[in-house]
Amino acid sequence: RANQVWALDTTYIPMARGFVYLTAVVDVASRRVLAHKVAITLEAVHAKEVIEQAFTRYGVPEIVNTDQGSQFTAEEFTEVVLAKGCRLSMDGRGAWRDNVFVERLWRSVKYERVYLKAYDSVSAARADIADYLSWYNAHRSHSSLERLTPNEKYLAALPPMAQAA
């Protein structure tokens, strides 16, 4: 069901000169991107901000899954998750398959958008990635979701009470 398990990860986004970091929160049941942030540093504060954004918009899941990246093992991040009463699940070190839903998102983001561009500024990367993720949620159907989009699957996977609200 929606909002039961959320997965977080961070990836590098190449630019014309250098790179930025993209962190996202994905609802595992629907593949919907609930929150994201493009930042110029890999710090726990960015992971904290993106999970807080998801909590504010969508409530609190039972489980938050991440890898063992320094931004996710930092107290600044773990305290926020645990204070909400979530169970924090961390993948085995180097075990990318454990977080396959976010890894698959990264493939889509990079091959369907990022690698076709050469962002010349952080603001251009932020705007274009936000545009892509909005499109991804609303229009990118998935064979694993019975050809539904993440938004369609998310709404269908909400508990009945949440749908009525």
Describe the predicted segments one by one:
Residues 1-165:
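Charged DNA-binding/catalytic regions of mobile-element recombinases
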